[in-house]
Structures are given as structure tokens and as C-alpha cells.
């Protein structure tokens, strides 16, 4: 099969992004999160106009093909009328997804993704429709008000030590009062809640200021719209649309790295918004000083405001996230040990944790099976293999020894003096929290100790985390290193 031409390849990511938005609206958030969110763009046959998508398991591939094939094809054809067929198959773990670098190119003529027709904004409960008593330019901006997803609000955002600063900053920014900082720069890894906070800012800001306008877009869409406006020789409309917003939010700004003309426009847009006293929220996957191939003047401007990091969720935060999600599912009966198991084992990011929970609930509902440990380990086999490979008892021992300045042999030695015994207990505790090893297996890796010794160590650390701030701080720091 011939690979797609550069023109086709350049358009596919944006087309898939638009199709995903259509699918979310058409199928509903729950169906999208459970079945469609994990789909990846695997291949494209430019001759036969066939899109191939990949998912994690055969069960998912069969279910999607049986129940959602029409929706998939309709979504793609809405964005790209020439598509003939959409196929879903199991992802090959040894192959890479179709990674496409969207560069600043002119869009090809002819059969290509067409822009979706603009529709009047529909009023949502949490987001006002087009602002009242505004200028014509403001009314045009109102078309973008419906971009905020209601479920991404402050009430649904679970707060913990990992995201407390970012949450408080976002709340302050959304109030709309006098600002001591502008822009607000949120950074952190994938799936930790940056986009959730940005949507929450938009929803809350418009709720408090119904006559104001807010605009959220990804940096990818910023570039795509900018290139399209240059091709249409109508950059004025593009600039006016962004710079007239009272609140402008650009997500994943690292996407414009190395794209000179887009960075030029981004800088002037950012400068205009801040100078005019309007609000600007930017997000990225790393801090400003760690962003590469971004102009220094942009990085300097970003650093003027408040820079807040969103860290990986610790065990307690993950546990609270699951409990919060289950509150909205009163029909679901999930045993406590399963809740703790999910919080311990799915620690990559919040998005993966929520996806795992949705998958368990959806599969249990469809198969009419009880949610027990056998069912969960079977349903999440792919995710659990990944997390098991990430952290081993040996990894934990090495990290604990580095933290307490001990030798690795101390983890297996018979020495019982406190300077060694306490870190060894911490390592046993972390081994139980972060791996799937049984108590006897953990004991074997600590010099052949009995499982009762491991139980004693776990209980000791659990007690000390309540009464000793230093121990609790050490444990939190070590867990965060593994979960980041």
C-alpha cells in the first residue's frame, strides 16, 4: 500500500480531531470515553479512501464495528466527504500509530476536508449562549461559546496536593476581578487535568460574566485556522476573532515549536490580548524554560504571569477521583478492594484512570458480570501489564536507597538499627502499593523475610504517615517519582 501524499498526511490529524468532536457529540460522552477515546489513527489508503483505526483489544474492535460503524463513517464524511470506508482493528503493539507532523503548508485544492458549517450556538446549562447586548463582532465570537464541555467544570475537578496550586490559580482567574498575574500558564504531563481546568475557567468566567466572550482552542487548531486564513487572504478576521475575546485560552502550546510564522502570529496575539487587559490562559506539557524551539520573546512573555504545574496524581488523589466518578454512577456496585486496586495500579495519569474505570463499568454492564478481581484483571489486562512493567520491587529498593543514602545490600541485610530498618519498611510499603507482588514475594526480595514481617512494615508506615510528617513527606515524594 502506498503511503498518503504529504498533502493528505498533513490534513489527517486535523480531520481526525474534528471527527472525534463530532463523535463525542453524536454518541455522548460516556460512550465516547468507554469505546472511542482510545482509537488511534493507524493507516490511510489514499487510493481507496479507506481510514483505518486501531484499538487496544479484539473485544473493543468487534463491538465498535458492530455498534458504531455508521457513526464513525458519518463523522469522517462530515469532515472529509471523499472517505469511502472506516475500518477498526486491533492495535499491533509492535507497530507505531500513524504519526503525522502537521507543518505549515498550503492546503491542497480539490477533494479535501471541508470546514464544518457554522451553526447557531445552542444554549447549555453551564455556559451562556451568545452574549446579550454586544457588538456585531462580539456576536460572531459567541459562536465559539459552546466549545466548553459541561462535565469539565470546577465541581467535577478533584483537588489534591498534586494540583492544588493550579486549581486555586484557575479559580482566581475565572472570577474575573482585578488580576495580579496574566497570563496563567498551566503545565504538566498528558492526562493530568490541564484541559479540564481550562474548560472550567471558561465555564465559570462566562457564568459570572454573561456579557463577555471566551474562546478556547488547541495550538494545533490555532495553526490550522491561521494557515487557512492566509490561504483565504483573510487574516484580519482570524486576528479579530481571537484578539477580541475577553478570555482567550490556547491548549498544548508546545505544538507550535519550530513553526516560525505561527509563532510570529501567536506572539502578536498574546501581546495584544495582555496589553488590552484581557485574560490569557496557556497550557503546555512542560514549563516555559523547558519548551524547545519556541521563540525567547514568547517564553519571556509566558513567564510574566503565574506558572502553575499540574503534577501526577498520588494514590489518595486517584482514590478520590474514582470515588467522585462512582458518585455519578449510583447503579454501579464496585467493591472497596477493586476501588483500591484501580487507584494503586492505574497510576500513569488521570485520563487513563478514568478510561479504565469507564471500561470496567461498560464491560460489566454489557456482559452482565459482577465486578470482581478476576473480571477487572481480565478487562484491564493491557493496562495492568504496562503498569506492572513500569515499577518493580528492585526499582523501589534502588530509589529508596538513593533517597536515604543507603547501599542496596541494606535492603536484604539482617541489620535492624533504625537508620536501615525504617527505609526498608518504606520500601516494603511502596512495593505493596505500586506492584502486584504478593506479600510472600515481597518478603523474598528483602532477604527472604516472612510475609508477616512485610505486613508489620506496611502497618508501621501506615501509622507513621498519620503521626510523623517526615515519614509521610518521604513516602509522598518517592511515590510521586514513580508515578511521574
Swiss-Prot record:
Chain segments carrying region Disordered: 110-146
Record carries keyword Methyltransferase: no
**Residue numbers spanned by region Domain II:** 83-146
The biased composition feature labelled Basic and acidic residues covers 135-146
Which cellular component appears as one GO term in the record?
Answer: plasma membrane
Q: Which CDD domains match?
A: AAA, Bac_DnaA_C
**SUPFAM superfamilies, per this entry?**
P-loop containing nucleoside triphosphate hydrolases, TrpR-like
Per UniProt, which keywords does this protein have? ATP-binding, Cytoplasm, DNA replication, DNA-binding, Lipid-binding, Nucleotide-binding
User: InterPro entries attached here?
Assistant: AAA+_ATPase, Chromosome_initiator_DnaA, Chromosome_initiator_DnaA-like, Chromosome_initiator_DnaA_CS, DnaA_C, DnaA_dom, DnaA_N_dom, DnaA_N_sf
Gene Ontology molecular functions: ATP binding; ATP hydrolysis activity; DNA replication origin binding; lipid binding
Pfam families found in the cross-reference section: Bac_DnaA, Bac_DnaA_C, DnaA_N
Q: Which PROSITE patterns match?
A: DNAA
**How does this polypeptide assemble, per the annotation?**
Oligomerizes as a right-handed, spiral filament on DNA at oriC.
State the family named in the UniProt similarity comment for this chain: Belongs to the DnaA family.
Its biological purpose: Plays an essential role in the initiation and regulation of chromosomal replication. ATP-DnaA binds to the origin of replication (oriC) to initiate formation of the DNA replication initiation complex once per cell cycle. Binds the DnaA box (a 9 base pair repeat at the origin) and separates the double-stranded (ds)DNA. Forms a right-handed helical filament on oriC DNA; dsDNA binds to the exterior of the filament while single-stranded (ss)DNA is stabiized in the filament's interior.
The UniProt entry, under PANTHER family, shows: CHROMOSOMAL REPLICATION INITIATOR PROTEIN DNAA
- What is the name listed in the Swiss-Prot or TrEMBL entry for this protein? Chromosomal replication initiator protein DnaA
Species assigned in the record: Zymomonas mobilis subsp. mobilis (strain ATCC 31821 / ZM4 / CP4)
Gene that this polypeptide is encoded by: dnaA
Amino acid at each position: 500500500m502506498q503511503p498518503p501524499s504529504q498533502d493528505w498526511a498533513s490534513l489527517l490529524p486535523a480531520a481526525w480531531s474534528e471527527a472525534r468532536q463530532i463523535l463525542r457529540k453524536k454518541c455522548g460522552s460516556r460512550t465516547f470515553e468507554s469505546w472511542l477515546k482510545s482509537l488511534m489513527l493507524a493507516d490511510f489508503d489514499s487510493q481507496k479512501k479507506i481510514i483505518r483505526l486501531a484499538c487496544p483489544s479484539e473485544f473493543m474492535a468487534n463491538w465498535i464495528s458492530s455498534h458504531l460503524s455508521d457513526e464513525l463513517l458519518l463523522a469522517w464524511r462530515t469532515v472529509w466527504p471523499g472517505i469511502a470506508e472506516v475500518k477498526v482493528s486491533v492495535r499491533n503493539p509492535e507497530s507505531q500509530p500513524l504519526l503525522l507532523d502537521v507543518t505549515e503548508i498550503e492546503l491542497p485544492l480539490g477533494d479535501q476536508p471541508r470546514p464544518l458549517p457554522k451553526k447557531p450556538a445552542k444554549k447549555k446549562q453551564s455556559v451562556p449562549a451568545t452574549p446579550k447586548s454586544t457588538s456585531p463582532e462580539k456576536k460572531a465570537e459567541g459562536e465559539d461559546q459552546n466549545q466548553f464541555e459541561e462535565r469539565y467544570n470546577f465541581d467535577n475537578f478533584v483537588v489534591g496536593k498534586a494540583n492544588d496550586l493550579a486549581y486555586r490559580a484557575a479559580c482566581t482567574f475565572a472570577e474575573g476581578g482585578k488580576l495580579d498575574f496574566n497570563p496563567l500558564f498551566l503545565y504538566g504531563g498528558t492526562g493530568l487535568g490541564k484541559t479540564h481546568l481550562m474548560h472550567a475557567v471558561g465555564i465559570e468566567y462566562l457564568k459570572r460574566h454573561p456579557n463577555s466572550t471566551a474562546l478556547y482552542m488547541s495550538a494545533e487548531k490555532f495553526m490550522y485556522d491561521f494557515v487557512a486564513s492566509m490561504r483565504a487572504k483573510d487574516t484580519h478576521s482570524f486576528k479579530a476573532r481571537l484578539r477580541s475575546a475577553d478570555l482567550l485560552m490556547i491548549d498544548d502550546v508546545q505544538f507550535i515549536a519550530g513553526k516560525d510564522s505561527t509563532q510570529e502570529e501567536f506572539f502578536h496575539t498574546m501581546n495584544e490580548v495582555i496589553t488590552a487587559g484581557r485574560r490569557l490562559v496557556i497550557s503546555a506539557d512542560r514549563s516555559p524554560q523547558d519548551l524547545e524551539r519556541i521563540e525567547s520573546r514568547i517564553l519571556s512573555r509566558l513567564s510574566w504571569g503565574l506558572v502553575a504545574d499540574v503534577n501526577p496524581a498520588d494514590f489518595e488523589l486517584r482514590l478520590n477521583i474514582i470515588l467522585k466518578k462512582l458518585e455519578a454512577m449510583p447503579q454501579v456496585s464496585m467493591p472497596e478492594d477493586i476501588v483500591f486496586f484501580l487507584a494503586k495500579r492505574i497510576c500513569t495519569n488521570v485520563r487513563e484512570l478514568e478510561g479504565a474505570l469507564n471500561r470496567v463499568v461498560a464491560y460489566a454492564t454489557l456482559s452482565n458480570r459482577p465486578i470482581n478481581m478476576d473480571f477487572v484483571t481480565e478487562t484491564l489486562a493491557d493496562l495492568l501489564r504496562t503498569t506492572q512493567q513500569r515499577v518493580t520491587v528492585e526499582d523501589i529498593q534502588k530509589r529508596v536507597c538513593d533517597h536515604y543514602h543507603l547501599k542496596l545490600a541494606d535492603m536484604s541485610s539482617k541489620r535492624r538499627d533504625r537508620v536501615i530498618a525504617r527505609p526498608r519498611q518504606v520500601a516494603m510499603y511502596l512495593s505493596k502499593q505500586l506492584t502486584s507482588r504478593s506479600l510472600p514475594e515481597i518478603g523474598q526480595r528483602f532477604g527472604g523475610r516472612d510475609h508477616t514481617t512485610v505486613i508489620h512494615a506496611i502497618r508501621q508506615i501506615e501509622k507513621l504517615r498519620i503521626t510523623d510528617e517526615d515519614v509521610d513527606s518521604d513516602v509522598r515524594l518517592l511515590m510521586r517519582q514513580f508515578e511521574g
